[in-house]
């Protein structure tokens, strides 16, 4: 879309490099620096920056580059939030696209029109509406809520137990079994309860407690679009050759043992940062701190 909005003479001057998410600022910044160095070796680098709001903090991760700070024009809002709102919330897509045509370069408006005809658009509309409905329920709270969740990573026989989410947000995406902690629960107790509710795993709670090999907190402020959500992931290694029986229940559409070897190629199929939780415990990729 960026290339389509540029004059033809400028397109050859612009290079695009993909950088994956890490939910780890240090790893991400290191990756950006490597990718830039590979794309333009032995070059002076300037970072064209705009400190829009608190989410712009990452610009400070590159002190070795010359920063060219751009002032915000109050009359020209920066960001795609308003565009997403029009695209995902209007009752009539054609009307929405007509409104966006006044805000965007012609090539971008045409691209979005074609994109809304693809099979991914309708599920994203449902995803957006589910997230907005979730946030709306908490807007009357006297302060921004912070949610506490638990997740279970159960490993055995070269496999890991995962669920497919049955509803939005994250419908049909793979995830670790888990959910919100109840008021009178300890973290481990809540993890085992959620595991049983979603997978019907045929393993007794005392056996799971003995199989616990690791616990980690995942607290990146942007790890969930629903709001600030801090999860406590518990890693269980049953160390059995047989895979215990499982059956999806509660809000899981599917519960299944998946081979560890298949996980690295599935990163884009996971809900929120659940692939990164798996990577933390299982070292699925070579990019680790």
Residue ranges, per PLM feature:
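Short connector loops at helix/strand junctions that flank enzyme active sites
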Residues: 11, 42, 147, 155, ...
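Short, well-ordered beta-to-alpha junction loops that form the rim of enzyme active sites
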Residues: 49-53, 165-166, 232
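Structural signal for conserved beta-strand scaffold positions within catalytic alpha/beta enzyme cores
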Residues: 18, 49, 68-71, 162, ...
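Unchanged
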Residues: 2, 180-277
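Nucleotidyltransferase catalytic core that binds NTPs
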Residues: 1-133
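Short catalytic/ligand-binding loop motif for oxyanion handling, primarily in non-cytosolic enzymes
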Residues: 25, 55-58, 77-79, 169-172, ...
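N-terminal strand-loop-strand
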Residues: 131-176, 203
């Amino acid at each position: 879309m960026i290339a389509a909005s540029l004059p033809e003479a400028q397109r050859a001057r612009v290079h695009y490099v993909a950088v994956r998410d890490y939910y780890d600022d240090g790893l991400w910044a290191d990756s950006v620096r490597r990718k830039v160095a590979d794309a333009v070796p032995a070059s002076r680098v300037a970072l064209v920056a705009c400190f829009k709001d608190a989410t712009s903090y990452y610009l400070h991760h590159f002190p070795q580059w010359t920063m060219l700070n751009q002032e915000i024009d109050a009359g020209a809002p920066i960001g795609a939030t308003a565009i997403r709102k029009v695209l995902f919330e209007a009752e009539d897509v054609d009307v929405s696209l007509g409104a966006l045509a006044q805000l965007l370069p012609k090539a971008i408006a045409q691209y979005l029109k074609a994109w809304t005809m693809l099979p991914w658009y309708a599920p994203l509309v449902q995803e957006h509406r589910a997230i907005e409905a979730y946030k709306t329920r908490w807007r009357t709270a006297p302060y921004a809520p912070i949610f506490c969740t638990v997740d279970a990573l159960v490993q055995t026989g070269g496999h890991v137990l995962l669920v497919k989410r049955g509803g939005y947000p994250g419908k049909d995406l793979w995830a670790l079994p888990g959910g919100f902690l109840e008021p009178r629960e300890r973290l481990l107790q809540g993890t085992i309860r959620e595991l049983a509710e979603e997978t019907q795993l045929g393993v007794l709670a005392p056996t799971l407690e003995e199989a616990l090999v690791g616990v980690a907190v995942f607290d990146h402020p942007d790890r969930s679009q629903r709001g600030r959500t801090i999860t406590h992931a518990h890693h269980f290694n049953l160390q059995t050759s047989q895979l215990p029986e499982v059956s999806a229940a509660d809000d899981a559409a599917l519960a299944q043992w998946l081979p560890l070897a298949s996980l690295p190629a599935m990163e884009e199929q996971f809900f929120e940062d659940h692939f990164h939780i798996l990577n933390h415990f299982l070292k699925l990729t070579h990019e680790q701190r």
